[in-house]
Amino acid sequence: MVRRVVATGTFDILHPGHVLYLCEARKHGDELWVIVARESTIKHKRKPLIPEEQRLFMVQSLKCVDHAVLGSETDMFEPIRQIQPEVIAIGFNQHWNENELKKQLAERGIKAEIVRIQTSDHSPYASSRTIRQKIKESDP
């Protein structure tokens, strides 16, 4: 049986921190599925600069990613229901509360182990926010 891992994110301004998160997530199974957030569903931070189809293309191009899909515009759990992962990998700085996520998954009959990826690249360029700020600062 193939052990599927799901990772999620916006992946706006793809950077080394994203790549590290996805490669570490891949180590928890045989197949890495990535759900790329849709612009219409992002509520907790600013809207992406890069259109969703281009973000999806960039994530699909990474060697450690086996499959990448856009998230649902109506139910964030729908792609997870379709993929049926054994593991859901959460990034070290993602806003999820693991216990709340487990509860929401259980309410939907989804059984998956939740793993928080602790590894991060401490480079100043491992944050989309920092990259945006550096671009603003360099603009004459």
Swiss-Prot record:
Q: Which Gene3D superfamilies match?
A: HUPs
TM segment ranges:
none
Q: What is the gene called?
A: ribL
What Enzyme Commission number does this protein have?
Answer: 2.7.7.2
Q: Would you identify the family this protein belongs to, as annotated?
A: Belongs to the archaeal FAD synthase family.
Question: Main EC class of this protein?
Answer: transferase
Please tell me where ATP binds in this chain: T10, F11, H15, P16, G17, H18, N93
- Which species expresses this protein natively? Methanocella arvoryzae (strain DSM 22066 / NBRC 105507 / MRE50)
Catalysed reaction(s) here are:
FMN + ATP + H(+) = FAD + diphosphate
Which protein, by its recorded name, is this?
FAD synthase
GO BP of this protein: FAD biosynthetic process; FMN metabolic process
Task: Cite the entry's keywords alphabetically.
Answer: ATP-binding, FAD, Flavoprotein, FMN, Nucleotide-binding, Nucleotidyltransferase, Transferase
Q: What does this protein do?
A: Catalyzes the transfer of the AMP portion of ATP to flavin mononucleotide (FMN) to produce flavin adenine dinucleotide (FAD) coenzyme.
The protein's assembly and partners:
Homodimer.
MF terms from GO for this chain are:
ATP binding; FMN adenylyltransferase activity
Q: Which Pfam families match?
A: CTP_transf_like
Pathway, per record: Cofactor biosynthesis; FAD biosynthesis; FAD from FMN: step 1/1
The UniProt entry, under InterPro entries, shows: Archaeal_FAD_synthase, Cyt_trans-like, FAD_synth_RibL, Rossmann-like_a/b/a_fold
Cofactor(s) listed in the protein's UniProt record = a divalent metal cation
